[in-house]
């Protein structure tokens, strides 16, 4: 079969998508108002970079393509400013975090686009249950074969990404005792988990065309894998991260993945084999459950190693790529978080323990979401 086209991208160019919670300023619950928000944004600058998601209490911002994490950060701040200004006119708030702590998925409303209606008819309750919030990171690849290699090689590091970004300890009003409960939600979808062990762009093209011919998929979006190729963009897309509480944290995560991807593409240190996926689900569970305090089974070692230690060792290994990309400032900050076993899940638990109020927790999350910006005038505090 002929090859799928793959748009050539600059090596490790970056882009990100961030899904945020739309919050009612009085009750601090999720509120289904993305239709109103999209109408209010109609004539705004960056309008095409702010999008609805499958349920109406979600909103997504998309960066454009960047070479540097700093440039991306500047753009995300501009997008946030537009959301803040618009929210003031319709009395809503926003926050990060992979889950809303006390929302009930049964109360969610599907956004009335043709695509989302079709997905709801296909997946029914799973669609509403997917009212969880993630950061997706795109990494540019020069060729389809590079994209396939990177998709498999990064699988080794998925526990890093989950542990660093974890921000969803509460779900449906309970403490799940997971650092990232969000990362367990999509397992029920078909075509979730990991890409099949396809070793070249030719093999992937053959697989894709078969799945299309059998009417299992219509396009690349029907694959819900943790990491998937995006040939129309010339990227691979990492989909396992919870939405951080701050824009700053989203940049730390992106800067780490960008440098790691450059190391993997330049040095090809990961030997692709089925062994990568023998341990994948267990390692993923360790990160979801225990975060930075989880353990990692590495196939060339006799015993598990702490995820935290593996992250720090990896950062040492890729230092020249970090510095070459100008990401040193962000990785230094990330290192401090890892050494101190601090991710957003730890912070969320700490805030909640202060007085045991979910409403005050969400209010604090809204404040944290604005911590990158100086404009806090519109935020309503709970009484």
Swiss-Prot record:
**InterPro entries annotated for this entry?**
GCL_type2/YbdK_subfam, GCS2, Gln_synth/guanido_kin_cat_dom, YbdK
Biological process (GO) annotations?
modified amino acid biosynthetic process
Q: SUPFAM superfamilies, per this entry? A: Glutamine synthetase/guanido kinase
Q: Which reaction does it catalyse?
A: L-cysteine + L-glutamate + ATP = gamma-L-glutamyl-L-cysteine + ADP + phosphate + H(+)
Q: Which EC number(s) are documented for this chain?
A: 6.3.2.2
Q: Which GO terms describe its molecular function?
A: ATP binding; glutamate-cysteine ligase activity
Alphabetically sorted, this entry's keywords are: ATP-binding, Ligase, Nucleotide-binding
Q: Tell me which Pfam families the record gives.
A: GCS2 (PF04107)
| Family in the record | Belongs to the glutamate--cysteine ligase type 2 family. YbdK subfamily.
Query: Record's HAMAP family?
Result: Glu_cys_ligase_2
State the function annotated in the UniProt record.
ATP-dependent carboxylate-amine ligase which exhibits weak glutamate--cysteine ligase activity.
Q: Record's NCBIfam families? A: gshA_cyan_rel (TIGR02050), PRK13516.1 (NF010040)
Please give the name of this protein: Putative glutamate--cysteine ligase 2-2
